[in-house]
Structures are given as C-alpha cells and as structure tokens.
Amino acid sequence: MAVPSELKYSKEHEWVKVEGNTVTIGITEYAQGELGDIVFVELPEVDDEINEGDTFGSVESVKTVSELYAPVSGKVLESNEELEDSPEFVNESPYEKAWMVKVELSDESQLEELMSAEQYSEMIGE
C-alpha cells in the first residue's frame, strides 16, 4: 500500500502536502480502501475557513458516509471540483487526481502534530 514519504498524515487518514504556506489535503490509499467504491464527495467552498479537527466535507461510498477532518486550520484556496463529477478518482488516484482542497495555513505549528509516512505506516499496520 502506498504511503508517500514526502507527505504528512493525520490519525483520521488525511494526507497533507506542504508547499510553503499552502497545503494540499486528501485521503490516504488506506482510507479509500476501507471505504470501498466512492460515489459522492462533498467539499467546502473557496474562501471557507476550516479549523483543525473540525469536519470540512464528506465522502460517500457504497458502504458508508465518512466525514473529512481538517488536519490543519486555514482558508480554502481551491476545492477539487473534478471530484463532483468523478468521485471514483478517490479510489483510482488518492494521492494525485483526488486531492480534496488546497488551504492557506493559518498556523504552521499544526504541521508538527502530523505523522511522518513511517509513523502512519506503523499506525495502519503496514
């Protein structure tokens, strides 16, 4: 199972790609595998504020609906609108095509609370 080393991870199975003061957030390959076939994705609007630990959207699979939890706080710069028409990208390409949101960080220290790829791999038993 892929756990890219350049990303950071949350206990709720979100990944975070850091690029300066902007982060890209998505869900991990492990999470999409647990959910099964994704049929719907709900994401926040551009300029919405998200807060660490709060829900910022949801993914619906044939099995269940799962909330998305913000691993960091900040302002949404971009939402991946392609996922509205192609939610299957979450299953097919969780780290590339299926990024969820791009966020301007409001508190960079929150990144220190996220896990490394090695720590995340241990958590999921890989």
Curated annotation (Swiss-Prot):
Binds 1 lipoyl cofactor covalently. It holds the Pfam family GCV_H. CDD domains: GCS_H. The modification N6-lipoyllysine is found at residue 63. The glycine cleavage system catalyzes the degradation of glycine. The H protein shuttles the methylamine group of glycine from the P protein to the T protein. It comes from Staphylococcus saprophyticus subsp. saprophyticus (strain ATCC 15305 / DSM 20229 / NCIMB 8711 / NCTC 7292 / S-41). The lineage of its organism: Bacteria, Bacillati, Bacillota, Bacilli, Bacillales. This is Glycine cleavage system H protein. Gene3D superfamilies: 2.40.50.100. Belongs to the GcvH family. Keywords: Lipoyl. PANTHER family: GLYCINE CLEAVAGE SYSTEM H PROTEIN, GLYCINE CLEAVAGE SYSTEM H PROTEIN-RELATED. One of its GO terms (biological process) is glycine decarboxylation via glycine cleavage system. Its cofactor is (R)-lipoate.
